[in-house]
């Protein structure tokens, strides 16, 4: 991976994390809970937990997060999020990289939420 690709990925993570907070998709407490589920139980569990929450617009959230995750694996238009998350679990390297990307995005979002006073 070239330095330019890494820099653009970092810039994208920063932008998406800000948008998650500024567009009201997640508040700081929701971000902290998602980070906890992601860290302790993994990517698929985070997706299932977000879907189970009535106070989280999971479709808006995962459309934003997909902008980062597509660097590892694209999601086709007809593919459901459930199938996408199950398919990435078949490749451990991709799964761990996506987990790192999601953690970084949510950590940045948490800092944005703190700075905006959410």
Question: For each of these PLM feature ranges, what is it?
Answer:
Residues 1-118:
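Small/polar/charged residue-enriched interaction surfaces, especially the RNA/DNA-contacting tracks
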């Amino acid at each position: 991976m070239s330095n330019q690709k890494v820099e653009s990925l970092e810039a994208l993570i920063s932008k998406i994390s800000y948008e998650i907070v500024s567009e009201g998709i997640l508040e700081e407490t929701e971000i902290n809970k998602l980070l906890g589920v992601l860290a302790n139980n993994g990517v698929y569990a985070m997706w299932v937990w977000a879907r189970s929450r009535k106070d989280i617009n999971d479709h808006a959230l995962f459309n934003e997060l997909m902008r980062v995750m597509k660097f590892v694996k694209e999601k086709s238009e007809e593919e459901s999020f459930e199938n996408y998350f199950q398919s990435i679990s078949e490749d451990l390297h991709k799964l761990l990289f996506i987990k790192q990307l999601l953690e970084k995005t949510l950590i940045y979002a948490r800092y944005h939420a703190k700075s905006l006073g959410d």
